[in-house]
Amino acid sequence: MDNSKQATLELGTKPVGKLLMQYALPAIAAMTAASLYNMTDSIFIGQGCGALAISGLAVTFPLQNLAAAFGAGVGVGASTCISVKLGQKDYATAERVFGNAFTLNVIIGVAFSIISLLFLNPILRFFGASDATLPYAREYMVITLAGNAISHMFFGMNAILRAASKPRSAMMASIMTVVLNAILSPIFIWPLHMGIGGAALATIIAQAAVLCWQLRIFSNPQCIVHFKRGIYRPVSHIIKNIIAIGISPFAMNACSCIVIIFINKALTFHGGDLAVGAFGITNKIAFIFIMINMGMNQGMFPIAGYNYGARNYDRLLRVLKYTMTGAVLITTVGWVIAQTMSYECARLFTSDETLIRISERAIIVTMLTFPLVGAQMASTGFFQSIGKAKISMLLSLSRQLLFFLPALLVLPNFYKTDGVWLAQPISDVISFVVAIVLLTKYVKKFKAAQAEGTAV
């Protein structure tokens, strides 16, 4: 038996705690690296291009999230399908899923770029760009969209690396992009005077370089899923499965796009361009801990998917317990930092005291109930990892749309800018309750099925 298949079989035999550490730590390191890579870009832009550049960058968030929605949908959908098929020992179908995911990433990445570039100015205006911030937002997005297919491929291949029992390779890919971006971005912004566009170019170059390394890994026949003839032609039932499972992360990112549009418009109306910039800074701070939690979830995905496919529900529930505990601890650390070091966090991004003051308030209020977010994310990830797409999508929508948007539409009428900040903690509390109710119901089902030897 080759090493890849042996590593895959360990998903059903190795102690769950050690296994989660083995998969989650590299994923956490990778996601931490990705969040730092995202944050350092903003720091370089804020310190090198000014407060309005930070606001211009914040205006691009909806479009970036929409692009990420398609990439996440394909990447997570494909990696979950691959994990389940490997658990069922169906290696041929796992490879076919890999090939179809590769094709989807290329098609969607290119199509999204073309459509967005054709209507870029109206899109950015709709997303909240003012006369002052539009030039920054446009300069950044023209370059980002030109390399969008590269970004799709990079993130998609990383998700599949984890499903193919190569979490360390996925971690290294993320770390390498951070290092390359951290080297190139300040060079492009300061010595080469390329401004915010230089930061975007550094990102694309870093991703392209590491994508070449990822493709080399998948060119090795020893990898449990690898490039070969006959796996790229789209197969309808495989595409449907990828989309069905990937609809949850797609919905999460797409909802972020919708919500951020409303946030930007509310902040522009009640607080101006600097309030939009403060939201951008707050987003980056929270994003670090959200991404670390996503790393926990990604560590859980192959373990939960494999054991669900193998009907080993005792191991399935154990990985859920460990993931939930870790997720809550992570977001609790984020909450402590937000409540005690908000000034220092804001100061990283800008020297503009007005922007710092607005950002302080935003960080404290927005992250008021942040520990609950960890539990909600772990629940969503669990349902996603076992292919319960509808429940996972419901939980994704509940936090970012169903509860958040009504609060966002109502509260600013009474509390102005503070109302925008308050909408998030209120939504977090309600969505946490919904997640725990659904999770408790399914935990009981799995325990009963384990005792009776039946399938869920």
Regions found by a protein language model. Name each.
Residues 54-114, 151-170, 278-336, 340-342, ...:
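Small-residue-rich hydrophobic transmembrane alpha-helices
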Residues 1-24, 82-149, 180, 189-246, ...:
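Short alpha-helical transmembrane segments in multi-pass integral membrane proteins
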Residues 22-41, 143, 177, 206-210, ...:
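Transmembrane helical elements of multi-pass membrane transporters/channels
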Residues 39-42, 114, 122, 156-160, ...:
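Alpha-helical transmembrane segments of multipass membrane proteins
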Residues 11-49, 62-77, 81, 106-113, ...:
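N-terminal transmembrane alpha-helices
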Residues 36-55, 124-131, 187-193, 254-284, ...:
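Helix-terminus/linker motif at the lipid-water interface of multi-pass membrane proteins
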Residues 75, 144-162, 170-181, 199-212, ...:
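Short runs within selected transmembrane alpha-helices of multi-pass transporters and secretion channels
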